[in-house]
From Swiss-Prot:
This is Thioredoxin reductase 2, mitochondrial. GO terms for molecular function: flavin adenine dinucleotide binding; protein homodimerization activity; thioredoxin-disulfide reductase (NADPH) activity. There is a cross-link at residues 509-510 (Cysteinyl-selenocysteine (Cys-Sec)). The gene is TXNRD2. InterPro entries: FAD/NAD-bd_sf, FAD/NAD-binding_dom, FAD/NAD-linked_Rdtase_dimer_sf, GSHR/TRXR-like, Pyr_nuc-diS_OxRdtase, Pyr_nucl-diS_OxRdtase_dimer, Pyr_OxRdtase_I_AS, Thioredoxin/glutathione_Rdtase. It comes from Bos taurus (Bovine). The lineage of its organism: Eukaryota, Metazoa, Chordata, Craniata, Vertebrata.
């Protein structure tokens, strides 16, 4: 805490609007490297607290040449375009349901070009909005590629090669990450795309192979299937490894039952372009060693992400990274191995790769450096949602993690299979709509985790996340009156435990 107070005091002592340093060097109170969600939040908060702040941001084009504006992964090639395309896919299902509700709606084909144009225009409006927000808060924006010169100095190189030297008392690294390419696979880099490219395609990707078991892989595959495209997911081992595995199985089961082909236990070996511009992919079945091949219009790699640290010259500043992951090592205060250099968001070791956590961490860091608070970011019980066709929202521990931490005899799991009311009239399949509440067995049965698979999962989980963060018990949730008729009310009606062995299927209504 003494070090924190000292850093804050030095930061507070610098006059805003500072002067140029030696040799034309520009001096700031705070430099933020990276114009994504976390970096922008930190920069805007610090500026609002009276500091002279600069943001350095540069987007290296993807191997396929895709580039975008200010705002980072979430705005440009992540959460925002993904959710909009997910919504487009859900609308397709609603159109198919419409006749059952009395609407004589024609089943029109989907136009990728129209959707892509609308999504890209919205993203560009957000890029512009970020520029305006920085300008309004008097944050200086540099569209340059940054690298460290020493512990307090950064060199920014523009697209035209012009160099700018900038110094600051404090520096925040918020460069995020980029999709990983399997460069050991022949043709992967030349012919494959990633989520960095998908949302900026002007034409439909057509028949698509998605390689990977991450939430990015399943979300992309799900929305492509929902838009009417022939889509295959190739999974080497375990889908959604970081999530509750029962829920992960239900997610993939639902996808497989609703049009997405899933190849399990397979690994690609080669991608080659055919004369007609299609791609031939050769893969091996890891259980039988049998080789197979298929033809696709697009191959999308979703096998994980790597931190954007390679070009930062971190060694010049003495900033340490994890040699395995490449991520920057930080403590609870987001401080790196250098006391006045910090890292937040996806680039930091051990942090959730989630936009809201990066934003909150950035704001809290700016407030601590300005002496406004000593509060640290709490990374426990962070809610999240996987936007697959049937959405999966969760907060807290998975069943596996709870058992590993507390022991099976000390964990009680309440669960239910339920049918959303809106699924009844069109007779939609609801066999994977499922809720699971993981609790300590001893009264009052503290809730350790909540998992929800069904429509609007993110909206459902957000509300319960507050209760779980505040230490809600199973008994308290069972005494919470639900809103009827909703899917969310089923959470407050979980009476069947796994231990009981009783059928958890919800029957009846209004009683």
């Amino acid at each position: 805490m003494a070090a924190l107070r000292g850093a804050a005091a030095r930061f507070r002592g610098r006059a805003p609007g500072g002067a140029r340093g030696a040799a034309g060097r520009q001096c700031y109170d705070l430099l933020v490297i990276g114009g994504g969600s976390g970096g922008l939040a930190c920069a805007k908060e610090a500026a609002q607290l009276g500091k002279k702040v600069a943001v350095l941001d540069y987007v290296e084009p993807s191997p396929q040449g895709t580039r975008w504006g200010l705002g980072g992964t979430c705005v440009n090639v992540g959460c925002i375009p993904k959710k909009l395309m997910h919504q487009a896919a859900l609308l397709g299902g609603m159109i198919r349901d419409a006749p059952h509700y009395g609407w004589g709606v024609a089943q029109a084909p989907h136009s990728w070009a129209t959707l892509a144009d609308a999504v890209q225009n919205h993203v560009k409006s957000l890029n512009w909005g970020h520029r305006i927000q920085l300008q309004d808060r008097k944050v200086k924006y540099f569209n340059v590629k940054a690298s460290f010169v020493d512990t307090h100095t950064v060199c920014g190189v523009s697209k035209g090669g012009e160099e700018t030297l900038l110094s600051a008392e404090h520096i925040v690294i918020a460069t995020g990450g980029r999709p990983r390419y399997p460069t050991h696979i022949e043709g992967a880099l030349e012919y494959g795309i990633t989520s960095d490219d998908l949302f900026w395609l002007k034409e439909s990707p057509g028949k698509t192979l998605v390689v990977g078991a991450s939430y990015v892989a399943l979300e992309c595959a799900g929305l492509l299937t929902g838009l009417g495209l022939d889509t295959t997911v190739m999974i080497r081992s375990v889908p959604l490894r970081a999530f509750d595995q029962q829920m992960a199985s239900l997610v993939t089961e639902h996808m497989a039952g609703h049009g997405t082909r899933i190849l399990r236990g397979c690994a690609p070996e080669k991608v080659e372009k055919l004369p007609g511009q299609q791609l031939r992919v050769t893969w091996v079945d890891l259980t039988s060693d049998r080789k197979d091949a298929g033809t696709f219009d697009t191959v999308l790699w979703a096998i994980g992400r790597v931190p954007e640290t390679a070009s930062l010259n971190l060694e010049k500043a003495g900033v340490h990274t994890n040699p395995v992951t490449g991520k920057i090592l930080v403590d609870a205060q987001e401080t790196t191995s250098v006391p006045h250099i910090y890292a937040i968001g996806d680039v930091a070791e051990g942090r959730p790769e989630l936009t809201p956590t990066a934003i909150m961490a950035g704001r809290l860091l700016a407030q601590r450096l300005s002496g406004r608070t000593s509060d640290l970011m709490d990374y426990s019980s962070v809610p999240t949602t996987v936007f697959t066709p049937l959405e999966y929202g969760c907060v807290g521990l998975s069943e596996e993690a709870a058992v590993a931490r507390h022991g099976e005899e000390h964990v009680e799991v309440y669960h239910a299979f339920y049918k959303p009311l809106e699924f009844t009239v069109p007779q939609r399949d609801a066999s994977q709509c499922y809720i699971k509440m993981v609790c300590l067995r001893e009264p009052p049965q503290l809730v350790l985790g909540l998992h929800f698979l069904g429509p609007n999962a993110g909206e459902v989980i957000q509300g319960f996340a507050l209760g779980i963060k505040c230490g809600a018990s199973y008994q308290q949730l069972m005494r919470t009156v639900g809103i009827h008729p909703t899917c969310a009310e089923e959470v407050a009606k979980l009476r069947i435990s796994k231990r009981s062995g009783l059928d958890p299927t919800v029957t009846g209504c209004u009683g």
